[in-house]
Amino acid sequence: MMQARYSVADPNALGVVPYLSEQNYYRAAGTYGSMATPMSVYPTHEQYTQGMGRSYGPYHHHQPTAPKDLVKPPYSYIALITMAIQNAPDKKITLNGIYQFIMDRFPFYRENKQGWQNSIRHNLSLNECFVKVPRDDKKPGKGSYWSLDPDSYNMFENGSFLRRRRRFKRKDVCREKEDRLLKDQGKAQGPISSLELPKHEKKIVIKSESPELPVITKVENLSPDGGSAMQDSPRSVASTPSVSTDNSIPDQHPASNGFSVENIMTLRTSPHGDLSPVPQVPCRTGMVPSLPINYTAQTQSSVYSQACTQSMDTSGSYQCTMRAMSLYAGDRPSHMCAPSSLEEATSEHHNGTSSPLTSMSLGSGQESVLTSSHHQQTATGGQTAAPWYLNPGADIGHLSGHNFGSQQQTFPNVREMFNSHRLGIESSALSEHQVSGNTNCQIPYRSAPSIYRHSSPYAYDCTKY
């Protein structure tokens, strides 16, 4: 049945169908005859093999094997031009020489005339790695020479023309050269600049901590000479420079004499009546007089303003009465009390007694600093108050009905004075022997409004209450 269907006369003719008509590679062998019976069991396979043999037969002549020389080389036009220039004896070549080199080396460009020469010309003119060299007169010919830029010899990776690192640009090359020069100069000047840098920093530090700088707004003493000045806690010492009569810039004076911790401790441990005078500290600004005040860090409740804590008389203290304070409540806008200097104080007093300027440090336990143990001395009655602690426009003599002499009155303590004045009772805390019949008193001296205003939260104004 199978043989009747396919009507194969010779079973050996199964493998005779040639793949190549000219060369019969699959010839019939004796072994193929024994395969006729088992292959007849698979009719589809037999039909497939016959159809495959027939289908591939007629198309073989239209697929000729292309020679290797006709394949396009895997090089760019820049690589081809570079090859031509580098193979030239003088490393320069004309345009026709580039054409000839490419056609001799690569036969693909010999037969393929599809505009590759135009591409060569474009690459020569557009790429900066190729430099046009004018032709010398000694060598006759046509066309200029083309050469490579000296900086473009390494534009291919490892000498391989298949890979180019990046597009060559002269701007990048110039920039790289400048960077190299800067790096070389930086390396050469590196040790010198490192040696000069500490000197410059040292100069800056010396200028910032120079003792010649005037300390106006700062509390800490930046001078290295003031070893005893308080630098740890700014609240412990509030310093305002006093004024010298001569406005001379001081040479390095140890400004910590009246502001040191030792002086504060001696004032606290000394008896209440013995108040040591503060030495005069010269200052650059000689405009507004002011007094140095020492505040301790513990004085929260018993610190008063300068007008009431600091006083002066011929023996060492000034006190103020309620009546005088009530008289001058509206005439004194400022709460700063400040004598200008010790020399003026001693020159204005005609009784010949010394008037030391005192500054007090009120501790937390000291509530009555000025006691009744202060000396009372009477002077001549017609002597008016010293004009150096008064305002120029508000002298005592201008007040009618009151004669202010130099008779001194003392109070039992400062706390009692302020309590009575705050309650508005003028005569409750004053005994009969404290206020004389002619109502003479020595009032607290006040100056013009100071430009250095005390920003301490512990200072109270006598005229407020």
From Swiss-Prot:
After the mid-blastula transition, expressed in the dorsolateral mesoderm but not within the dorsal blastopore lip. During gastrulation and neurulation, expressed within the dorsal mesoderm and the lateral border of the neural plate but not within the dorsal midline. In neurula stage embryos, expressed throughout the entire somite-forming mesoderm, at the border between mesoderm and ectoderm but not within the notochord, neuroectoderm or lateral plate mesoderm. Residues 174-196, 219-258, 339-385 are annotated as: Disordered. Pfam families: Forkhead. The keyword Nucleus applies. SUPFAM superfamilies: Winged helix' DNA-binding domain. GO terms for molecular function: DNA binding; DNA-binding transcription factor activity; DNA-binding transcription factor activity, RNA polymerase II-specific; promoter-specific chromatin binding; RNA polymerase II cis-regulatory region sequence-specific DNA binding. Keywords: Activator, Developmental protein, DNA-binding, Nucleus, Transcription, Transcription regulation. Residues 72-166 bind DNA. The keyword Isomerase does not apply. Residues 174-186 have a biased composition (Basic and acidic residues). Residues 230-258, 352-383 have a biased composition (Polar residues). Transcriptional activator. May be involved in the dorso-ventral patterning of the mesoderm. GO terms for biological process: anatomical structure morphogenesis; cell differentiation; mesoderm development; positive regulation of DNA-templated transcription; positive regulation of transcription by RNA polymerase II; regulation of DNA-templated transcription; regulation of transcription by RNA polymerase II. It comes from Xenopus laevis (African clawed frog). InterPro entries: Fork_head_dom, FOX_domain-containing, FOXC1/C2-like_FH, TF_fork_head_CS_1, TF_fork_head_CS_2, WH-like_DNA-bd_sf, WH_DNA-bd_sf. This is Forkhead box protein C2-A. GO terms for cellular component: nucleus. It is found in: Nucleus.
